[in-house]
Amino acid sequence: MARAFLFVLDSFGVGGAPDAAAYGDEGADTLGHIAEFCAAGAGDRAGLRDGPLSLPNLSELGLMQIARSASGRFPAGMPIPEKVYGIYGAATEISRGKDTPSGHWEIAGTPVSFDWGYFPTEGDAFPEELIEALCRDAGVSGILGNCHASGTEIIARLGEEHIRTGKPICYTSSDSVFQVAAHEVHFGLDRLLAFCQVARGLLDRYNIGRVIARPFIGHSSSTFQRTGNRRDFSVLPPEPTLLDRLIEHGRHVHAVGKIGDIFAHQGISRLIKANGNEALMDATLATIDEAEDGDLVFTNFVDFDMVYGHRRDVPGYAAALEAFDARLAEVHKKLKPGDLVVLTADHGCDPTWRGTDHTRERVPVIAYGPGIRSRSIGVRRSYADIGESIARHLGIPAGPHGRSFL
């Protein structure tokens, strides 16, 4: 029986979304702009990386052709390989959003057909009645922030006041999200998670997709830094996903990284926690060794988005891509006959774009494994085709939204 390994390179978009203008993202292209900056020397950083973007393994899996089909151009400064291995294409998101749950749920065969709730960008972000209920039910004297903000910026700006007053820092972004930053020692991690659970219950009526706990440590604005104890409190997907269907048919779903949180821990057999792309790859490789016939290993590589995309760090994003590319050889060595690897993304987060938010883009679709014939699958109409292809590979019935490319 077959196994499947689904890797989401969080935010690794390839541009070209036909509805990007509706999201203020016309022209956004995460891969294309990173390559362009690197080719021009703007992706160099002493001691980290220099020169054109170099992704030889991903290129041999069709990344150059994917970029051209999605955005109409090859990435600058990157050689085109003589031969491509495996299946390659791009996918267009049909969900109404450019957020993490929408992208992942659609990848798993369940597009989001409803509109998320969002908070206003002008004035106070949160309704007064929400803040009053949250402070009352969670037992705090008030909150700080109450605005749209970058997570690292608001910690630097309000972290010392948070320590002094004991008030959690609450903020949002262009996503359907309520984020809470608090000091792990002065406020306490358990207290932060309990606060977020209260917020999750109150925010359902506002149709907010996620509450995110953002713990940090440090003593002053110059030393504050986030820890690896982030946790997402998501609403449930609107209908059964690929993960639920696999469980229903007696298979195992191994969720590596934040996958469990994204799916509200539904359709998960086993959670494997790890922080940072390198540790996530280590955990994924170990899980591949342990996976049985019929299993799915599902990993989100979060650093591309959280550490580099939102912070608009081109050299950091480029270096992370190159490090991931180098480790694909370790994945190749572990594959057995019948295995399928799928590489994709959930949205874009162009590090050259204005602001700090996600960008609406198409995503790459790469599928390979022993016996997989190389071919182009063009531009798919929905991310859901990915989930349906995995369903077919693992021998379970098709779902209602996507079409398999296998």
Curated annotation (Swiss-Prot):
Q: Where does Mn(2+) 1 bind?
A: D10, D346, H347
**Cofactor needs:** Mn(2+)
Alphabetically sorted, this entry's keywords are: Cytoplasm, Isomerase, Manganese, Metal-binding
**Which BP terms does GO give this entry?**
2-deoxyribose 1-phosphate catabolic process; 5-phosphoribose 1-diphosphate biosynthetic process; metabolic compound salvage; nucleotide metabolic process
Q: What is its main location?
A: cytoplasm
Q: Which reaction does it catalyse?
A: 2-deoxy-alpha-D-ribose 1-phosphate = 2-deoxy-D-ribose 5-phosphate; alpha-D-ribose 1-phosphate = D-ribose 5-phosphate
Entry cofactor note text?
A: Binds 2 manganese ions.
Pathway named in the protein's UniProt entry: Carbohydrate degradation; 2-deoxy-D-ribose 1-phosphate degradation; D-glyceraldehyde 3-phosphate and acetaldehyde from 2-deoxy-alpha-D-ribose 1-phosphate: step 1/2
Q: Where does Mn(2+) 2 bind?
A: D305, H310, H358
**One Pfam annotation, family name?**
Metalloenzyme
InterPro entries xref list? Alkaline_phosphatase_core_sf, DeoB, Metalloenzyme, Phosphopentomutase_DeoB_cap_sf
The record's GO CC annotations read:
cytosol
Q: Keyword check for Glycoprotein, yes or no.
A: no
- Its EC number(s): 5.4.2.7
Q: Where in the cell is it found?
A: Cytoplasm
Q: What class of enzyme is it?
A: isomerase
Record SUPFAM superfamilies: Alkaline phosphatase-like, DeoB insert domain-like
A GO molecular function for this record?
Answer: manganese ion binding
The entry's function note states: Isomerase that catalyzes the conversion of deoxy-ribose 1-phosphate (dRib-1-P) and ribose 1-phosphate (Rib-1-P) to deoxy-ribose 5-phosphate (dRib-5-P) and ribose 5-phosphate (Rib-5-P), respectively.
Which NCBIfam families is this protein grouped with? deoB, PRK05362.1
The record's comment on protein family reads: Belongs to the phosphopentomutase family.
State the protein's name: Phosphopentomutase
Q: What is the native source organism of this protein?
A: Rhizobium leguminosarum bv. trifolii (strain WSM2304)
